[in-house]
C-alpha cells in the first residue's frame, strides 16, 4: 500500500458517491482502493440533482454491512451534504478516488476533478477503472430492475438484497 512517510500520519483517500444503493461495482473499487492506501473514507454524498430511494443513514448502513460482508478493510463510512471539497478540507484528506466505468464517466469526472482543483489547489483525484464485468453496472439500473421484480442478486451483496427489494418493488 501507499503509506505516508511519517508513522503518525495516515493518508486519507475519499471515495465519494451517492451509493443509492451500493453495488458490487462500487465495492470492487472500494476493495482495490483499500489495498492501495492506508485508509479509504467512503463518503455518501448528497446530489440535489439526483433523487435517492434510500436515506443517507440507510446508504451508510448498507455500505458498512457490505464492506464487512466482502471482507474489505481500511474503510470508514461517512456522509456529506455539502460540497465535497469542503469535506475534503475539513477532514485533511489528500486524494479523491473515483471509479470509471466508461469513457463517458471520465468526461464528467475529469470536469469535477478540475473544479475541485480550482476550489482547492491540493485536491488530487485518482481514477480507478472498473473491472470489465462491472462496466455496465449502475445503481440506477439496479433500482429499475428491482422495481419490476427482476433478480438483482448478481449486482448487490446478499446482506442488503432483501431491504432493497422491499423498498423498490412495485408489482
Model-derived regions, located:
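Classical nucleotidyltransferase
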Residues: 60, 79-171
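Short, surface-exposed acidic-centric catalytic microdomains
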Residues: 27-84
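Cofactor-binding loop segments of dinucleotide-utilizing enzymes, especially the Rossmann-like FAD-
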Residues: 18, 45-47, 130
Amino acid at each position: 500500500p501507499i503509506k505516508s512517510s511519517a508513522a503518525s500520519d495516515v493518508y486519507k483517500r475519499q471515495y465519494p458517491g451517492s451509493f443509492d444503493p451500493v453495488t458490487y461495482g462500487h465495492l470492487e473499487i472500494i476493495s482495490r482502493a483499500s489495498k492501495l492506501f492506508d485508509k479509504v473514507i467512503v463518503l455518501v454524498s448528497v446530489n440535489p440533482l439526483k433523487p435517492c430511494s434510500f436515506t443517507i443513514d440507510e446508504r451508510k448502513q448498507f455500505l458498512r454491512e457490505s464492506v464487512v460482508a466482502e471482507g474489505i478493510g481500511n474503510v470508514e463510512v461517512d456522509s456529506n451534504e455539502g460540497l465535497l471539497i469542503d469535506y475534503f478540507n475539513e477532514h485533511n484528506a489528500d486524494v479523491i478516488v473515483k471509479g470509471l466505468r466508461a469513457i463517458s464517466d471520465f468526461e464528467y469526472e475529469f470536469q469535477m476533478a478540475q473544479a475541485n482543483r480550482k476550489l482547492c489547489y491540493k485536491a488530487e483525484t485518482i481514477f480507478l477503472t472498473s473491472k470489465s464485468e462491472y462496466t455496465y453496472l449502475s445503481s440506477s439500473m439496479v433500482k429499475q430492475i428491482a422495481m419490476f421484480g427482476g433478480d438483482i442478486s448478481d449486482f448487490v451483496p446478499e446482506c442488503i438484497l432483501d431491504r432493497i427489494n422491499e423498498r423498490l418493488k412495485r408489482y
